Amino acid sequence: MVRALRVTCARQHNSDCSFMIVCTLALMTLASIGNPIFPGDYADPELHLFQGKYYVYPTYSAAYDKQTFFDCFSSEDLREWKKHSRILDFKDVAWSTNRAAWAPSVIERDGMFYMYFSAGDGAGIGVAKSAHPEGPFQDVLGKPLVKEYINGAQPIDAMAFIDDDGQAYLYYGGWKHCNVVKLKRNMVETEGQFKEVTPENYVEGPFMLKRGGKYYFMWSEGGWTNSSYGVAYAIADSPLGPFVRKSHILDGNPEVGTGAGHHSVLKLPRTDEYVICYHRRPPKSTLRDNRVTCIDKLIFKENGEIEPVVITREGVLPWPAIKK
C-alpha cells in the first residue's frame, strides 16, 4: 500500500525530469511497513514510544523450557527494527524457575524503566529495572512482586499503567480472572487491596488505554493455541472499573493470519491516530509457537467506540518517532 499524492513538476522543459524522479523516490518511502514487522517467533507484544524511538517488548514464542529470556526491538519509524538481545535473562532471576518468560510490560517513571514480567507459568510476576529502555534490566526484589493466586487469577500477563494524577496501577491475570492493584511511587511495591475487575469472556492479556477522559480496558479471549483467540474491550469512567464488555475488536483472517490477540495500543506522535500491535499465526500454520508480531490501524468512531480491526499483510505507513 502506497499513499496517493499528487505531485506537479515546476520545471516544464527538463527532459530527464529529475525533479519528478526525486519526488517518486520520496513517495517510495511511504510504502507500508509490512507484517510481520520483524522476523522470528514473538508474541504478546507491548509497543511504546521512549526517548525518541519506538520499542516493542514481546514474548519469545517457543517451548516453555526455551523461554528463558526477553528480547526487545527498537525503531525510529516503525519500519526498520533493531533487535536488543536478552535484555533480561532468567539465569539472573533465581526465583523464576528458568522457564516460561512471558508478556513483559515496560513503563517509565522518574527517568527509570520498570519491566513487569511473568515467570515459570505461574511462579509469579516480577519487576526489573533499567536506566535505558533497551536494558539491560535487573531483577529488583529477588522474589515475585505478585506470587499468590488472588481472586482466582493466575499471576501472569501484567500491564502497568500510570494515570494522569500520577497514580500507578498494575493489571494482571490468567485463568479467566483479572485483578488490578495500585503501585507505590517506587513502582516496586503494591499498596492496598487487589480488586477483581474481570469482564465477561476475559481470559488473559489485559491492556489499559486512557482517551478523552475514558478508560478503555482491553483483553484477550478464546484459546491462545487456536483461531478462537481475539481481543475485546470495555469503556469505564474509572481505572478500577466496572468494566462491562462492549464488543470484540480483533479477530484472525484465514487468508492473512489466525489467532490474533494479546495486544497493545499506541497513539502515534503528533497525530490523533492509533495503532494496535499484536501477534498472529501465519495463514495455514498449525505450529503452536509460530506467532509473529504485527501492527495495524486502530480506529475510534466519533462516539468513542472502537471499530473492528482489519488485519493486513501491509500493516501501516511508517511514522517517525519523536521524544516526548
Go through the PLM ranges and name each one.
Residues R3-R6, R11:
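Basic polycationic patches enriched in arginine
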Residues L27-K324:
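Carbohydrate-active catalytic/glycan-binding domains of CAZyme proteins
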